Amino acid sequence: MWSLALTLPSPSLVSVRSTKLGRSVSNGGRNWSGLTKLSEKSKTKRGNGLCCKAELSELAPVVSATYGVLLLGGGLFAYSKSGSKGSLFGGLTGSVLMASAYFLTKSPETRVLGDTIGLGAAFLFSSVFGFRLASSRKPVPAGPLLLLSIGMLSFFVMAYMHDSLPAISIPDPLPLP
């Protein structure tokens, strides 16, 4: 009988590798890289990363279109699943209201009207899903839809207040002598 033994070198406990910050020494699972260099680098150069600098008035058309598509999709899904004409009518109504809010919020002259229509539609669907949740006592599908509608309602309230209320000017404090 033949036997073949293959000997492999055992891994060392200390390994050294090169990184962008210099040499990194790893000892038994502990990484002792140039931590001072990393902290200095993070203090000197701040990356932009994922940063959204959009205002509510710029986000309102996207939010209203997304909410309208979700309402239409939910109405079509409920109609195909259970034949509910009420859900189909609600989905179509919500998508038409959100489409009008979408087109109105794209123009600065009609932005407040679009916010108002979005606010009214979100309030309407929050009420509908709240009543459905209270009457059926089943958390699905009325619960998540209620949370989504409350989120849209709060968004459109903030967008309406942002677009319709005038900016508050704070007077400069008295100069010190």
From Swiss-Prot:
It comes from Arabidopsis thaliana (Mouse-ear cress). The chain crosses the membrane at residues 85-105, 111-131, 140-160. The keyword Transcription regulation does not apply. Keywords: Chloroplast, Membrane, Plastid, Transit peptide, Transmembrane, Transmembrane helix. This is Protein FATTY ACID EXPORT 4, chloroplastic. Residues 1-63 form a transit peptide. One of its GO terms (biological process) is embryo development ending in seed dormancy. Belongs to the TMEM14 family. InterPro entries: TMEM14, TMEM14_sf. One of its GO terms (cellular component) is chloroplast membrane. It is a multi-pass membrane protein. It is found in: Plastid, Chloroplast membrane. For all TMEM14 proteins, 4 hydrophobic alpha-helical domains are predicted. However, NMR structure determination of the human TMEM14A showed that only 3 of these helices are membrane-spaning while the amphiphilic N-terminal helix is probably located at the lipid micelle-water interface. PANTHER family: PROTEIN FATTY ACID EXPORT 4, CHLOROPLASTIC, TRANSMEMBRANE PROTEIN 14, 15. May be involved in free fatty acids export from the plastids.
